[in-house]
C-alpha cells in the first residue's frame, strides 16, 4: 500500500497532457491510506477529461467518503501513450488521489455511459492486475462492479463484471459497502468471494450474472434462470424517491486541467416523461423527480462561491421542463454575488420560443451557439418517435434565436428511424434550409449546423424490437443529405460514422455470447473505440465471424414479441405491455398519412392522466413536480393543436428552396 | 486604473499542469476572493490578467509573475479598499495547493509588461543520463571532473551550436549568447545515476533559452529533472533586478538544501 508516484513521475515528461494523472482537484479527498477501510476505486473507462466531470461518479465519491470505514478514490483510462509506458515498466493502473495500485482496492467500480467503452473496461481491469474474466478471480482480487445507463442490458459484459448496479446508486452503494465490510472482516477466505456475490445478488438493484444460468436453442435465448432459490428472477432497478434528500455533489471536483463540461453542474431533476420512443435515458430514469427550487438556488450559490466557476449548468434530460425554470434562472442571474459575470447553460433545450426566451436571458454574458434536437425531419417521422415538435414550434424557436442575436444554431437529428423513408431523411435538409431562411431575415451570415447520428435501438425502450439500419443504408442516407445540402452555404452537415453506429448496435442489444467478441477485440488492441483515430470496424466484424455470431442477426433483425430479450430479467419498471403497445402505436402513427397520426402519440404524464407504464406504480413512488401544469408556452404535445403539426409557415414554403 | 503585480510559486504535483491551466486557476481564485478585476469589453469579456513568460509544463518555479488590472473605482488602501499587502495570503487560500502567491505590489502606470521586460531567468535542475542513453563517461570516477570540463568548454567557446526539434522540424541555433552563467552545484545523490545539480542564468531574448538546450550542449544523452525557475530578471538603469522590489519572503528560499521536492 505505497504510493506509486515515484515511479509514475518520471513517465510524465514523456506523455501528452500529464495533468491527467496527477489528481490534485479541489474537492478531492487528497492522499490517504486505505487501511481498515472498504476501499472503492471509482473508474471511468475513458480518458480523464471525459471521465472527471461524470456526475454519477462524483456523487458516489462523496457519499462513500462521508461514510465511516469507507474510502473512495478515482481512476480513469490512461491514454495510449501512458498505457504503453506503464506496461513497459510493469506499472499497474493507479488511483489519481493517492496514486495507489488499483489492486489494493476492494472494488473497482465502473461507470458505463456508452457501449463503445466496453473494451476499455477490460483493459482497465487487466492493467489493474486482475483477471478479466470474473470466473478466474479469487478472494485476493477486487470485485469488479459497474453502474450507469448501459447496465440496463448488462449481458455483453456478464463474463467480466462481478456485480452490476441497476438504477440510482445513492442508496445501494451503502448496502454494498456493508456487505464488503463483512467479507473483509471474515478474512476473504477461499470460497468467500462466491458467498459474498450470492449475498449481493439478494440486494435490491444488484445483478450478479454468475448467479444466473443462460440457455439457448440455436441462436435464440430461451431462458435466464437464477441458480439459487433466494436470488430474484427479475432484478428491479433502484430509484431514489426524493432528490431533495440527496443534495450531491456538495463538493464538486474542480480539475486543474481542462475537461469537458468544465463548469458547475447542478442536477435540477432526474427522469423524463416526454416519452420519446428512441430515448433510453427517458425510459429508464422515470418518474420525474424535481429538486426543490430553493435547494437548487442554494447549491448554485454555494457551488459558485466554492469553485470560482463563472458558469453553471442546470442539468437534467430536458431542463426547460423544470417547474419555474424562469424564476430559478432569473434568481441566479440577478444574484448580486454573481455580479453579472455568471452564465447559465441549459443542456437539452426544448424546441420552442419560450425556451429561447430563457436562453437569451441566461446567455447575456457569453453567447455561444444554441442547440435544438428536433431528431427527425418530418412531422410524420416525429409522430413515430413521439417527439411532437410542430414545424411552427421549430421555426418559432429559430426565429426567436436569430432575432435575439444568435447567428448560429445547431440541430440534432437521427437517421435510420423506424418507418423512415427518403422523404423523411431529406426532410432534415429542408428543415435546416428553412431555418437558414429564417435566420437570413436577421443576419446575412446566419448558419445552421445539422448534426446527424445513426439510430441505435436501445434496450428497455419501445424501439427495442426494431432492426437497425445497416451501415451501408445509413451511409446512403447521409449521402442523400450531403447531396441535398451541398450547395447551401448556410447549412453545415455533420454526421456520425455509420461504422461506429454498427458496433454500438452489436454491444447495445447483445447477449452473453457477445462477451467473447468484446474480449477478442480488446486482446487485439481495440481500446478507445469511441475515438475515431482508434476505432477499427474490422476488429469487430472479424471477431463476430470468429465466434460464429451474425451481425445481421444481432443488429439488423427485427424482433418478435415472443422473443426472450437478453435484458428481460433486468427491469426499469416498465411493463412489457406498455413498451409493446407504444411500439405498435409508433408503427400505426407511421402508417397514418395526415394529421391524424398524433392520435397514436403518448402524452407527457406529468400533466396528463397516467397511462401506467409501470415506473411509478411498481415501486410505490410518484412524480415530484412543483407545478401540476405544463410549462408556459406548452409544447411538444402538451396543450397544443397537433393536427397542425406539419404546417409550414407560408413565407417559408414560398422562399426556401435554393 | 490600478495595476498590481503578483509573484507566485508553482511546486509539487501541480507542476504537471500547463500555462493555460494555471491561467484558469488564477481566474477562479480571483472570483473566489471577489477581487474587482477590470474586464475586457466585447462579446466575450475576459478579466484583464497578463501572465509573464510561460513556464514549461513539468517545471517548478518560485519566481512566477502576473499583472492584474483592477476596475477604476477600486481603492487601494487597507482602510476602505483592497489591502495589497494582505493579497498574497487571501489569494493563496483560494488557489490550489502547490500554487501560492508570495508577494504583491502596485506597479506604476506605464510599467512595461512582463513579456517585454524580463531579460533573463535563473534555473536550477538536475542533469541525468536519458533512459537507455550511452554515456560511458558518466559512470566513471571522473564524471564530475568531466562534466565540469564540459561546462568550462561551453563557457569559453565563442559559439555553441545545438539542434533542437520544434513542431517536428529540426532547428539549428547558436545558444552561446543566451547562456549568461552556468555552474555545477553538487551531486544529487551518492551515486552518479542520481545526477548533478546545475544552475544557469539564461536569457529570454531573442527567445527563451531552456535548460534542456544547455544539456544538449553538454551531452545530447543528458536530460533534465526537477527543473525549477528561481528568478526572473529585468534591467533597470543598467542594473539587474527582479520584477518586484519586495525582498524574497523567507519561505521561498532557493538554497540547494531546500530543493527537496514538494510532492
Language-model-detected regions and their locations in the chain:
Chain B
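Short amphipathic alpha-helices in soluble, non-transmembrane regions
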Residues: 78-95, 137-157, 214-215
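A short, aromatic/hydrophobic, helix- or strand-capping loop or linear motif
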Residues: 36-44, 102-106, 161-168, 227-230
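Short, charge-patterned binding micro-sites
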Residues: 38-73
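N-terminal, Lys/Arg- and Ser/Thr-rich interaction peptides
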Residues: 1-6
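Core RNA-modification/binding signature centered on pseudouridine synthases
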Residues: 145-263
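Short beta-strand-to-loop capping motifs
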Residues: 8, 68-76, 125-131, 200-206
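Ordered, amphipathic secondary-structure segments that act as subunit-interaction surfaces
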Residues: 62-124
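N-terminal ordered "arm"
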Residues: 11-39
